[in-house]
């Protein structure tokens, strides 16, 4: 079972090497890996880092683009593996993650995607926001089209999908600012549903001040609501639940942001 993993980067040199190493180390467990790196014309140390791993990267593209979604879509067009995913240039896989994914996808050939646990880490790699992680993991055992319409509990760095499924569902929407991964998850789910990869986390999502999730969480949750409405229809029970969850999460994130600002002002 061949994997195609895509990393889109632009001036992400600070964490990029850790990301690359976490991907190429998956080969140690015998995984057939195609690694595609799309760089949007970085002016920091990114290209030096990428070129230093040239022998381990299958395809390197370095040219200007319209942002991360455009870059990932470029990678999706180049992907030739049966199982596809993207890993942002500040996130990382855990050891043996792809081997576990391969085992689950082989056991469930009709499923369009699979997902697992994903830790949230800070800039130093320390786990944070364990409550949010536990909240998402609560829904894993109840995964269905209904529950994924209620709440986006699948963390993108821990989601993998069949290339045949995305060819039917279509690539990422470039008109969305932040919820393009959730929109794709909903469309992929309609191609065969998803299955949970049990056990320890597959990946780490890095939360830092320049990440999309940190800067645009209000926009993200509004867009997530809009794409859920498009997928589930209105009015429906799952959209009412999504609306309630959305405002609960936005309120929590806002309170956390205010608390950080107050601490910084002391």
How should these model regions be labeled?
Residues 32-41, 61-64:
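Short beta-strand/loop segment that forms part of the nucleotide-sugar
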Residues 12-25:
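Short, well-formed alpha-helical segments that are part of the catalytic scaffolds
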Residues 84:
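Short aromatic/hydrophobic "clamp" motif used to bind/position activated sugar donors
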Residues 6, 137-223:
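Conserved nucleotide-sugar donor-binding catalytic segment
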């Amino acid at each position: 079972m061949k994997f195609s993993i895509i990393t889109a980067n632009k001036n992400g040199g600070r964490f990029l090497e850790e990301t690359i190493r976490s991907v190429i180390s998956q080969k140690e467990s015998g995984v057939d890996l195609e690694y595609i790196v799309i760089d949007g014309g970085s002016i920091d140390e990114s290209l030096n880092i990428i070129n230093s791993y040239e022998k381990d990267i299958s395809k390197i593209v370095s040219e200007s683009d319209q942002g991360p979604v455009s870059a990932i879509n470029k990678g999706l067009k180049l992907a030739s593996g049966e199982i596809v995913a993207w890993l942002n240039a500040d996130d990382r896989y855990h050891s043996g993650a792809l081997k576990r994914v391969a085992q689950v996808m082989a056991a469930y050939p009709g499923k369009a995607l699979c997902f697992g646990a994903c830790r949230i880490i800070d800039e130093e790699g320390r786990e944070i926001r364990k409550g949010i992680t536990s909240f998402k993991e609560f829904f894993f055992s109840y995964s269905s089209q209904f529950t994924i319409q209620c709440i986006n509990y699948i963390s993108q760095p821990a989601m993998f999908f069949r290339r045949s499924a995305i060819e039917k569902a279509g690539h990422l929407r470039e008109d969305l600012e932040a919820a393009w991964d959730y929109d794709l998850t909903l469309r992929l789910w309609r191609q065969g549903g998803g299955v949970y990869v049990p056990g320890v986390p597959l990946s780490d999502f890095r939360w830092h001040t320049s990440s999309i999730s940190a800067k645009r969480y209000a926009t993200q949750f509004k867009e997530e609501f809009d794409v859920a409405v498009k997928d589930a229809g209105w009015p429906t029970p799952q959209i009412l639940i999504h609306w309630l969850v959305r405002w609960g999460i936005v309120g929590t994130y806002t309170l956390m942001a205010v608390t950080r600002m107050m601490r910084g002002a002391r």
